[in-house]
């Protein structure tokens, strides 16, 4: 799980680096084509058909739509915001999943978990700093702040939709078509964004690195969920923010302000608390099953 989070953080950093040379729509399209190619080969190697009626399941379609929102929103946020800020906001996704499960799925959420969700959003506000103390992210870059929130909401929607995907839909097949919708997203963005450019050799290296680490992240997180106990490995998702902060300093020469660190710690603490409460709630249910 830790390796997968390091891979995803590295992939995110390559998106931001590439955005200095290519428009976002072009990055999305290259990423989608690369990921689709890798996972298509994985499907063929495992004897899994690329096309089947299963990919038309409403949950798979909903996951694809959420993937478009998440990818477009977060990619554009990465191009506009500091890497550390965008990565910290990303950590609130599990809290939005809890919120969505309560509202859309009618799951029972205790007041303790509700409190943790609210506290987590307070952490986001501390990072964005709408009050304008020292640095107001909303005022400096309102589009980037909004896109980050849109992106993380899309990620939460993707996770919620994944819960309803039938078990007979292989993960690798779902991932293949997940990257396919990223290609579609890139095409749609190209209609409204900057014109494409011919990438240089070094830019293609960035794109290839992005695809490699994105695929490594997916394969390793899938392995972690299958090999280890989900309740045991899930908290290690938050190591992603550690790697993101290291990369933000090492690659982008960003300064980690106390405000960003405090906000990120609050979000992570709230997320881990929600996970602990959900784990305790699941134990009695398993005992009664």
Where are these regions (language model features)?
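Glycine-/small-residue-enriched transmembrane alpha-helix faces in small-molecule transporters
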Residues: 1-26, 137-164, 287-289
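Membrane-interface interhelical linkers
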Residues: 1-6, 20, 36-62, 135-140, ...
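Hydrophobic transmembrane alpha-helices of multi-pass small-molecule transport proteins
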Residues: 112-131, 259-278
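Hydrophobic/small/kink-forming positions within alpha-helical transmembrane segments
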Residues: 5-10, 40, 64-72, 95-99, ...
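Cytoplasmic-side transmembrane-helix entry/capping segments in multi-pass membrane proteins
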Residues: 1, 54-64, 109-122, 141-145, ...
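C-terminal transmembrane-helix exit sites in multi-pass transporters
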Residues: 76, 94-118, 242-261
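Helix-helix packing/entry segments at the starts of transmembrane helices
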Residues: 86-92, 165-181, 218-249
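Specific transmembrane alpha-helical segments of multi-pass solute transporters/efflux pumps
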Residues: 7, 47-85, 90, 126, ...
